[in-house]
Design a protein with these regions (language model features):
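Short helix- or helix-capping micro-motifs
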Residues: 94, 186-197, 244-248
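Membrane-proximal stem/loop segments at transmembrane-domain junctions that anchor or position
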Residues: 302-438
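Loop-to-helix entry region of an early transmembrane alpha helix in multi-pass inner-membrane enzymes
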Residues: 132-136, 147-168, 190
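Short acidic/glycine- and proline-prone juxtamembrane loop motifs at membrane-interface regions
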Residues: 204-212, 250
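Membrane-interface alpha helices of multi-pass inner-membrane proteins
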Residues: 237-251, 262-263, 283-287
Length: 561
């Protein structure tokens, strides 16, 4: 690929994007490197590290945008360049790559919220706190107990079903890469989905994040395809809508991201992004309808606001614990009234604060009090923040560090990826624990200790594949590169994942499963079709056909004649 020259008319945009990106990365380094080292930040150190990091970040981004990323673009296929991409062959290959870890963890991983979901199934009392679609999927597999007589086999059915569905989604994502970028990009995508360790771990894990990530990635990959090629068949449009709806049903905070995304699409009114607004509005509407139908069918109770209040809860708890002398008695009394904890146990309750996990604090929020007096508590949160801005900042950074910075050590108290089955399938039904085979016990223990517990902190190369911050920084660089090149429709498409990342920062803990949808997005964020020149625009939807299509010759040929 030859040396590229950039037009003058985009120089201001490129300069602004470069400076903005450098400022963001420098600030993240200045703040988060301190949190990674000692858990607190200092203004003087922050300013010093920002001034040091800004020019370095600007130089690195300039090299990436001018020399590295353009060379990673794929040449478009020609008609004679190999056979068409085989979706079902890719499905089989990806599925077979997930079998070994499934056998090691047989009948699969049933942790995270699995116990709560099985308890809902056993009691018949459902709640929208957990995704109803995923709970009903587990119920479907457990319903085979009458035939199989073993919950172990029911769990294996769930794992195999999820592995098949995720393999199908990943194969369709690679097919979209083949059509919109190149078959070589699709083959690299297949290798990525086959061999990346996280895919193997989550394919047989009973968590909503597996199918959610696969469906969200498929939805976005098909949006990228239409943005690049300007066309998409009716069948693939239907698949795109279904994937988007299922993703929204699996995670309610994606609905918030969709709402913000649609607002941006309406405000920008970019011609090339009209299909995004149309498809996004359809997915958003259908997801709301399906959520209401599922809740009505199962008579599910309402959800909770505790998850959304994770960050404010830990910020005030940290302020009470570490800066109580700055607070007034009135503020302390108001803060105590937020939590369903006895007065004599209140001090011990604040001592349970964990900087990396919000569960010990937000689980004790008095939801009725918060709902009825939300204006007072909002004013309390603001007033405490005015006197403790440093405490608030450190509380947020400690909680969100894995999503903001390529950390040296995985500091989170919870495991990076939870494995094992435990009593999740049997305890809610009053049955004895499963008797699982132990033929792969040594391998399972080694994986738990060296990979899944700490995100491979002690494994030299693999640790960077598991590092959440590396993935987020790489995705951020690709978003900036799209803006640097002036690919407006691509930037708008990427914005959906950016908004989901923002909602993700408000969560109670950062584990590997929260990284997973962003990890799945890497192939189509990084795979870009090669342009003939740096100024060539993306192929637009409903491209204007030349007279050659109608009259048997091009305009230039007829003018020559």
């Amino acid at each position: 690929m030859g040396k590229k020259t950039l037009p003058r008319e985009g120089s201001l945009r490129r300069t602004l994007v470069l400076l903005l990106g450098a400022a963001v990365y420098a600030m993240l380094y200045a703040l988060c490197s301190q949190i990674d080292e000692n858990g607190v930040s200092c203004m003087d150190v922050t300013l010093r590290r920002f001034c040091m990091g800004f020019p370095i970040a600007a130089c690195i981004l300039y090299v990436l945008f001018h020399n590295v990323f353009p060379r990673m673009e794929f040449r478009p296929d020609t008609e004679q360049n190999g056979k068409p991409f085989c979706i079902w062959g890719a499905v089989l290959l990806i599925f077979l790559c997930y079998i070994p870890l499934f056998l090691i963890e047989y009948p699969g991983t049933f942790s995270y919220d699995s116990m709560k979901q099985v308890q809902q199934i056993a009691s018949g009392e459902y709640s929208t706190i957990l995704p109803l679609l995923h709970t009903l999927m587990i119920r479907l597999c457990i319903s085979f107990y009458g035939i199989l007589g073993s919950l172990e086999k029911c769990g294996a059915i769930y794992s195999l079903l999820q592995m098949a569905l995720m393999s199908l989604c990943f194969a369709m994502i690679c097919a979209a890469l083949s059509r919109s970028v190149s078959r070589r990009a699709a083959r690299i995508g297949v290798a990525f989905f086959c061999l990346y360790p996280n895919h193997m771990a989550f394919a047989s894990s009973c968590t909503k994040d597996g199918l959610f990530s696969a469906c969200l990635t498929l939805f976005m990959a098909l949006c990228f395809e239409e943005a690049y090629t300007g066309k998409l068949t009716t069948g693939w449009r239907i698949i795109r809508v279904l994937a988007g709806v299922v993703a929204c049903l699996m995670r309610s905070n994606l609905l918030l991201a969709f709402a913000a995304w649609l607002l941006v699409l309406m405000l920008t009114r970019k011609q090339g992004g009209r299909f995004l607004l149309r498809e996004g509005a359809l997915v958003f509407s259908l997801a709301l309808i399906c959520n209401a139908l599922l809740a009505g069918m199962t008579h599910a109770s309402g959800g909770t606001v505790k998850e959304l209040l994770s960050v404010p809860a830990v910020q005030m708890a940290r302020a009470r614990l570490y800066a109580g002398d700055r607070l007034t008695d009135r503020q302390k009394e108001m803060m105590d009234s937020m939590f369903a904890v006895n007065a004599e146990n209140m001090e011990a309750f604040y001592q349970t604060y964990d900087p990396t996990v919000a569960d010990s604090i937000k689980n004790f929020l008095d939801e009725d009090a918060v709902r009825s007096r939300w204006q007072e508590y909002l004013a309390l949160w603001v007033s405490v923040g005015r006197v403790c801005p440093d405490i608030y900042l450190d509380a947020f950074l400690n909680l969100a560090l894995p999503s903001l910075y390529p950390y040296k050590t995985f500091h989170v108290t919870h495991r990076y990826i939870e494995t094992g089955c435990g009593n999740a399938l049997t305890s809610p039904f009053g049955l004895p624990p499963l008797s699982l085979p132990e033929r792969f016990k040594p391998v399972q223990q080694w994986l738990d200790v060296h990979l899944f517990s700490t995100g491979a902190d002690d494994v030299p190369v693999i640790r960077w594949l598991f590092n959440c911050g590396v993935v987020f920084w790489l995705l951020g660089a690709m978003v900036l590169f799209a803006g640097y090149r002036g690919d407006g429709t691509i930037v708008l498409t990427m914005t959906l994942l950016v908004f989901y990342w923002i909602t993700h920062l408000l969560g109670p803990v950062m584990q590997g499963r929260y990284l997973y949808p962003f990890l799945c997005a890497l192939p189509f964020f990084m795979a870009r079709p090669q342009r003939k020149s740096s100024t060539e625009p993306l192929r637009r939807k409903n491209e204007i056909k030349t007279d050659e299509d109608h009259d048997g010759g091009s305009v230039d040929e007829r003018n020559h004649l």
